[in-house]
Design a protein with these regions (language model features):
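A glycine- and Lys/Arg-enriched "phosphate-lid" helix/loop adjacent to the NTP-binding pocket
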Residues: 137-211
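Conserved substrate/cofactor phosphate-moiety recognition/catalytic segment
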Residues: 52-94
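P-loop (Walker A) phosphate-binding loop of NTP-binding proteins
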Residues: 38
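Glycine-rich phosphate-binding loop used to anchor ATP phosphates in small-molecule kinases
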Residues: 89-170
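Hydrophobic anchor at the beta1->P-loop junction of P-loop NTPases
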Residues: 35
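Conserved lysine of the Walker
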Residues: 43
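NTP-dependent small-molecule kinase module
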Residues: 5-8, 187-249
């Protein structure tokens, strides 16, 4: 079926309206794979290596630049004030994170034109995202609600936003690659990279994330999951084989 779709595209590239494009992209059966893991787990390092080795894949970075660019009158970023005062800023930050992640994912899917994809690959398009909307809701928002940092009313609003954005996604989540790193090791990496706004993080916070991630992934039934502990050559090869196993020939 994909071969016949490709033949049709080669004849009709450029005739699709913006409204028609998501439906047509679905006919190409793209896959969306999320790189999951704790803060400081090594997700970015893994993604950079995958980028270097797989030029045909489409990578979607976590929108940290958006969170860092929104600043108050004291030039403190949203990310920074969230870590400093989570009780005050958890709802604001998590809402921004959810919306900006959705925008990044949808923008990436629309930026890969049909003509460009056909020139690169005969397989289904591959999109690799650093975390996904489900992580925002099932891991971070629920964790903050359980800690009392997002109240019941705020969580109700957040859930409506999540439900709307998730139902608006061009394609659903296909699979997860989980970078499984001990929270203590994560904290050491966080200290070494010295990223703005992260100095307030504690091992207790990282352990809470780890537990929520475990609970969420254990509940998944229709999403394939690969657990990995590093970005070694052997692990990279295993990850690439896992991604390729999700492709529709």
């Amino acid at each position: 079926m994909l071969a016949s779709t490709m033949h049709l595209v080669k004849r009709k590239v450029g005739v699709f309206s913006r409204r028609q494009l998501p439906r047509f992209l679905s006919s190409l059966r793209p896959i969306l794979i999320s790189i999951e893991g704790n803060v400081g787990a090594g997700k970015s390092t893994l993604i950079e290596e995958l980028k270097r080795r797989n030029k045909n894949w489409n990578f979607i970075d976590e929108p940290v630049d958006v969170w860092s660019s929104i600043k108050n009158e004291d030039e403190e970023s949203l990310l920074s004030v969230y870590y400093k005062d989570p009780k005050r800023w958890s709802f604001s930050f998590q809402s921004c994170a959810l919306l900006s992640r959705f925008q990044n994912i949808e923008k990436a899917m629309r930026s890969v034109t049909i003509q460009e994809h056909l020139c690169k690959d005969e397989h289904s398009p591959v999109f690799i995202t650093e975390r996904c909307l489900d992580t925002d809701y099932h891991v971070f928002a629920k964790m903050l609600r359980d800690k009392g940092l997002i109240d019941t009313l705020e969580f109700g609003i957040y859930r409506r936003l999540y439900d709307f954005l998730r139902s608006s996604m061009t394609i659903p989540l296909t699979a997860i690659i989980h970078v499984d790193t001990n929270p203590h090791d994560c904290l050491e990496r966080i200290k070494l990279r010295n990223r703005t706004g992260e100095s307030e993080l504690s091992v207790v916070y990282l352990q809470s994330i780890e537990q929520c991630q475990s609970d969420w992934m254990s509940s998944l039934q229709d999403v394939s999951i690969l657990h990995t502990g590093s970005s070694s050559t052997a692990d990279i090869s295993r990850i690439e084989a896992f991604v390729n196993s999700q492709l529709v020939p």
